[in-house]
UniProtKB/Swiss-Prot annotation:
Location relative to the cell: Endoplasmic reticulum membrane
Binding of heme, residues: 455
InterPro entries xref list: Cyt_P450, Cyt_P450_CS, Cyt_P450_E_grp-I, Cyt_P450_sf
Functional description taken from the UniProt entry: Component of the seco-iridoid and derivatives monoterpenoid indole alkaloids (MIAs, e.g. vincristine, quinine, and strychnine) biosynthesis pathway. Catalyzes the conversion of cis-trans-nepetalactol (iridodial) into 7-deoxyloganetic acid. Also converts iridotrial into 7-deoxyloganetic acid.
GO biological process, one term: response to jasmonic acid
Entry's induction text: By jasmonic acid (MeJA).
Lineage start: Eukaryota, Viridiplantae, Streptophyta, Embryophyta, Tracheophyta
The entry's keywords: Alkaloid metabolism, Endoplasmic reticulum, Heme, Iron, Membrane, Metal-binding, Monooxygenase, Oxidoreductase, Transmembrane, Transmembrane helix
Keyword DNA-binding assigned: no
Name this polypeptide is given: Iridoid oxidase
GO cellular component: endoplasmic reticulum; endoplasmic reticulum membrane
Amino acid sequence: MATITFDSLNPVTVAISAGFLLLLIIFVKSRTGSSKRKPPGPPGWPIFGNMFDLGDLPHQTLYKLKSKYGPIVWLQLGSINTMVVQNAVSAAELFKKHDVPFCDRKVPDTLTAFNFNQGSLGMNTYGGHWRVLRRLCSMEFLVNKRMNETTDLRRRIEDNMVRWIEEDSLASKAQGGTGAVQLSRFLFLMAFNLVGNLMLSRDLMDNKDPEGREFFDCMNEILELAGTPNIADFLPLLKKLDPLGMKKRMVDNMSRTMKISSKFVQERLDNRKAGKINEKKDFLDVMLEYQGDGKDGPDKFTEQHVNIVIMEMFFAGSETTSISIEWGFTELLRNPHAFKKVREEIDRVVGVNRMVEETDMENLPYLQAVVKETLRLHPALPMLLPRNTMEDTEYMGYLIPKGTQVFVNAWAIGRDPEYWQDPLSFKPERFINSSVEYKGQHFELIPFGSGRRICVGFPLAHRVVHLTLATLVQAFDWDLGAGVKPQDIDLEERLGLTLRKKNPLNVIPKKRVHI
């Protein structure tokens, strides 16, 4: 009988075995001790826990688990303690009474490339640097006065989108096609150019700007990587190995993106030295001019900080906004009675001799209801961004250990039959004469989150989603294609960094308002 000695073992085998043994010890420890005071949840596998139990659409799986385990569900994702909040009462408790201890972020490994998380607003540790960025965004960039100054800019970019849609449809017909356009592409380009103008005062998707197109391509790669599940996030011992190569790919794409954004920054610095100052400040100006007081946060932003914020604003502002618009327009096409009501309201208030403006929105209550209903059913971030507990915390009768990852399932909360009648149906009328808003104070509707880390960009998203939906309804009649009925339009989801339509909306536009 052969004798197995330690010397006969392959070093790699030994390392892997030791690693799995350590993970097993961590898993067993996580299942003992104070487990009686943790929320209920499904049993998991050794080492991996519930990693493979949630499927491709975890927000839907967790929604179904609520009936068995209640509104607070405990998961073990590899070695990561995870809590999921799934109703308005528990969300209110978290945001109103425990916002600070739950205010940190759990950061995916890919977003630590170039220390992205340390310069980011959305993924930064709760502290001085985050507070400075938050203050600059909310008081210097996204305050009403600033946004009112860029109203004409947004209308121009919307008009460009209308022109692109019409030109693409005509080109399709000229080549023997149906004239159908993939709407999501134009919505993303519109949002991308909008962020480009607000951040850098330039159209990045101009045909004369090849660097803008390369920047666009890199940003799409970053979005895909940031939204792809990574085993290293659940088994942190694997982070240095980067087993799926995702960190390396993220470094490559961020490197290319930063080289381009550095050119934009240097160009601005050169112009400022030459006395060429923008008449209206964009966010790059705000960041370059920032001087801290040395008490809270940095005294000034480094070039890397500036580049990180530029990247973040593009993928946060472009992706979430365009997705929300596509979901809203999909629901309008699936529900012709709702489309008709929006069209009639716009024609009554605006007419057909000019395009709808942001100032018209207060007189379009049904459109406002459509946006609320869209965000209720289709939040762009279905479980918001992951939080991280900064200390052991007593919450809803449970002891939540420090370092626990916390998700709030806004998708499930928006479909909770305890708060919403006929919750799975698209009924904008439910918001007519209703005081419920999505500004973080009504916890049955929190697509942008709540508390200190509520999405800082929601005031801008609010304006753009309303204006774009109104523009699409006003500017075009829409044909679904031969034999396609409204009820044939599917609502299948695909989850990456955000919740997209699995099958992009393809429709045939016919110009209605010629202005």
